[in-house]
């Protein structure tokens, strides 16, 4: 099989995995009363002040709206006043797809992604600026940075990592799913002391053949050397997708860090 065909199969698998996940999430009915908590009545929404913010960044070829059902997994009372955002990446030519235009946060030169794959440093930094603008808007609206969580899958996971590391303040946390390091070690010079206090959750399927498991494994040592606390979770048998177990784990992880953040405020 030619390298181009292998790539096309890998890309198709990545997009299919994202589509299947979105479909599965849409089919999953939220627990009783969850819809009312996630979408308050207009008067309640006006009276309630958002206490936290979760920003979810999708993978290559996907869209923000397709990932919105993810929030149905976050049924704990702590998320009653949480604001969610699922932005969509701009349509851009992607090198690994022979220049085809598709939703992409930055350019990707090759798939499968390994720990040694070339990176689009300038494109990543431009995308980071856009993510930081989203975060700054929520901070300006009164949400403490310590109650802001950035999460992402695949390419969105790589952007999550870059955005959290380069944000000048301590955030509630960054959660990476099947992501990778989108830059070299030189970026550590740009990381502020406050950013190093932001906790990282990194989840990766061992059977991932799009963003190889070795690419995920390279993350924690880099983060630890840079002064970050990183919790790494490996999922046997999981390919390039997100499992329900990962999302329930994320809910618990954010809830714990959100509680810690709120205690600091009180």
From Swiss-Prot:
Which keywords are on file for this protein?
Fatty acid metabolism, Hydrolase, Lipid metabolism
The record describes the protein's role as: Possesses carboxylesterase activity in vitro.
EC number(s) of the enzyme? 3.1.1.-
Similarity comment: Belongs to the AB hydrolase superfamily. AB hydrolase 2 family.
Organism of this sequence: Oryza sativa subsp. japonica (Rice)
The keyword Disulfide bond appears for this protein: no
Q: Which GO terms describe its molecular function?
A: carboxylic ester hydrolase activity; palmitoyl-(protein) hydrolase activity
Q: Where is the active site?
A: 154, 208, 240
Identification of the protein by name = Probable carboxylesterase Os04g0669500
Q: What class of enzyme is it?
A: hydrolase
The terms describing its cellular component in GO are: cytoplasm
Q: Name one Pfam family in it.
A: Abhydrolase_2
In the record, biological process GO terms are:
fatty acid metabolic process; regulation of plant-type hypersensitive response
């Amino acid at each position: 099989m030619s390298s181009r065909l292998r790539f096309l199969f890998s890309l198709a698998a990545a997009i299919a995995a994202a589509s299947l996940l979105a479909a599965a999430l849409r089919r999953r009915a939220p627990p009783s009363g969850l819809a009312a908590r996630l979408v308050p009545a207009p008067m309640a929404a006006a009276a309630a002040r958002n206490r936290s913010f979760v920003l979810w960044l999708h993978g290559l070829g996907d869209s923000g709206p397709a990932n919105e059902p993810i929030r149905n997994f976050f049924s704990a009372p702590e998320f009653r006043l949480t604001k969610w955002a699922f932005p969509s990446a701009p349509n851009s030519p992607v090198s690994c797809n022979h220049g085809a235009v598709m939703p992409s946060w930055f350019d990707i030169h090759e798939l499968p992604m390994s720990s040694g794959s070339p990176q689009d440093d300038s494109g990543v930094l431009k995308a980071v600026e856009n993510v930081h603008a989203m975060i700054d808007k929520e901070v300006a609206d009164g949400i403490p940075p310590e109650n802001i969580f950035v999460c992402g899958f695949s390419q969105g996971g790589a952007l999550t990592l870059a955005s959290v590391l380069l944000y000048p303040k301590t955030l509630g946390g960054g959660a990476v799913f099947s992501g990778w390091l989108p830059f070299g070690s030189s970026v550590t010079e740009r990381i502020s002391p406050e950013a190093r206090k932001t906790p990282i959750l990194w989840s990766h399927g061992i059977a991932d053949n799009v963003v190889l498991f070795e690419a995920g494994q390279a993350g924690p040592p880099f983060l630890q050397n840079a002064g970050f606390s990183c919790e790494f979770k490996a999922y046997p048998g999981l390919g390039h997708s997100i499992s329900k177990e990962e999302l329930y784990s994320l809910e618990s992880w954010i809830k714990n860090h959100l509680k810690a953040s709120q205690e600091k405020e009180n």
